[in-house]
C-alpha cells in the first residue's frame, strides 16, 4: 500500500473534516481551530447584543432526505434537546448551557473541560434506543441535531412530525444531504445565534472560525498532483467501527485535493476490501 503524507495544514483540515463527519460538525470545527480560552474570551466580550432577533423567525432547514423545510421559531428557546454532541458544545460555548434539558449518551469518552460540562447534563440514553416518547417528556421547545442521522422514522422521528406537534427543529446545514460548501459550517453558528437571540456572540465566534478556515485553505491551496485516496473510519467505545462519507466530508476532501475511496459509509468493511481499495491515507 502506498504511503503519502499531508502537509501540516492539510492534516489539520483533515482532522476538522473527520470531526465534522462523525460526531462533531459546526462547533467541532470550532473545537479544531480555536481553543476553549479563546472562545471563553470571545463570549465574555460579547455579553450585550447589538442585534436583536425579530420573532417569529423563519429559517430554511433540511430533512433527512435533503428536502428544504421552512421552520419557524416563535421565541428564544428555553428548553432544548440536543441530539448531537457538536450542537451541545456550541450551546455551551455560546453561554446557553442552562437551556439544555436533555442530551444523548456520547459515542466515545470525552476529554478536557468540556467532558465535565457535558457530564453534568441530563442524558436520555443511547441515541439508538431513545424513544420519541422519552424526548417529548422533556417538553422541548427546540430539538437540535443532524438531519440524515437522527430525524428519520427509524430514529427519533422526522422533522415534519415534530413540526406538526408544534416543536421547532434545527438540523445542521453542514450535515444536510445537499451539495455542500464550507460556508455552511460557519452559517450554522450564525443561525444558532439568531435563533437564541445571541447574534453578537455567535457572529464574533463565526467570524473567528471563518478567519481560521480561510487561513488553513490558503495553506492547502497549493496541493497538486493526483488526488489522495482517503478512507475515514470512526471507532466507538463498544469496539465497533464504521467507514464514513458525507456531502460535507467530500467537500472538504476536494479542498485538500483528495477523495474518499467509498461512495457511502457503512459498517461492513473487511480487511480484504480494505486492501483492495488501497487508500493512501486512513484517518
Question: Each predicted region: which residue ranges?
Answer:
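Extracytoplasmic substrate-binding proteins
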Residues: 157-237, 263
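Structural recognition of the beta-strand scaffold that forms the well-ordered cores
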Residues: 81-83, 101-104, 142-146, 169-173, ...
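A short, structured surface patch at a secondary-structure boundary
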Residues: 79-138, 142-151, 261
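A local structural motif
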Residues: 68-77, 114-123, 202, 255-265
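Bacterial Sec-exported substrate-binding components of ABC uptake systems
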Residues: 2-8, 22-89, 195-231
Amino acid at each position: 500500500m502506498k504511503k503519502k503524507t499531508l502537509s501540516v495544514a492539510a492534516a489539520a483540515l483533515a482532522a476538522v473534516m473527520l470531526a465534522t463527519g462523525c460526531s462533531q460538525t459546526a462547533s467541532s470545527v470550532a473545537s479544531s481551530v480555536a481553543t476553549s480560552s479563546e472562545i471563553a474570551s470571545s463570549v465574555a466580550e460579547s455579553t450585550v447584543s447589538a442585534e436583536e432577533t425579530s420573532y417569529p423567525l423563519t429559517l430554511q432547514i433540511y430533512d433527512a432526505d435533503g428536502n428544504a423545510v421552512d421552520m419557524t421559531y416563535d421565541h428564544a428557546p428555553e428548553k432544548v434537546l440536543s441530539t448531537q454532541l457538536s450542537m451541545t458544545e456550541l450551546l455551551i460555548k455560546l453561554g446557553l448551557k442552562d437551556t439544555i434539558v436533555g442530551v444523548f449518551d456520547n459515542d466515545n469518552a470525552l476529554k478536557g473541560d468540556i467532558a465535565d460540562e457535558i457530564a453534568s447534563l441530563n442524558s436520555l440514553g443511547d441515541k439508538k434506543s431513545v424513544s420519541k416518547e422519552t424526548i417529548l417528556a422533556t417538553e422541548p421547545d427546540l430539538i437540535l441535531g443532524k438531519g440524515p442521522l437522527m430525524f428519520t422514522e427509524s430514529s427519533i422521528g422526522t422533522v415534519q412530525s415534530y413540526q406538526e406537534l408544534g416543536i421547532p427543529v434545527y438540523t445542521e446545514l453542514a450535515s444536510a444531504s445537499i451539495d455542500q460548501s464550507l460556508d455552511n459550517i460557519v452559517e450554522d453558528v450564525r443561525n444558532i445565534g439568531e435563533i437564541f437571540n445571541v447574534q453578537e456572540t455567535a457572529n464574533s465566534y463565526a467570524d473567528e472560525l471563518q478567519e481560521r478556515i480561510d487561513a488553513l485553505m490558503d495553506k492547502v491551496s497549493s496541493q497538486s498532483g493526483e488526488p489522495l485516496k482517503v478512507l475515514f473510519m470512526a471507532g466507538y467505545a463498544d469496539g465497533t467501527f464504521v467507514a464514513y462519507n458525507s456531502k460535507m466530508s467530500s467537500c472538504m476532501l476536494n479542498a485538500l485535493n483528495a477523495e474518499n475511496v467509498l461512495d457511502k459509509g457503512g459498517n461492513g468493511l473487511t480487511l480484504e476490501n480494505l486492501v483492495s481499495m488501497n487508500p493512501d491515507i486512513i484517518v
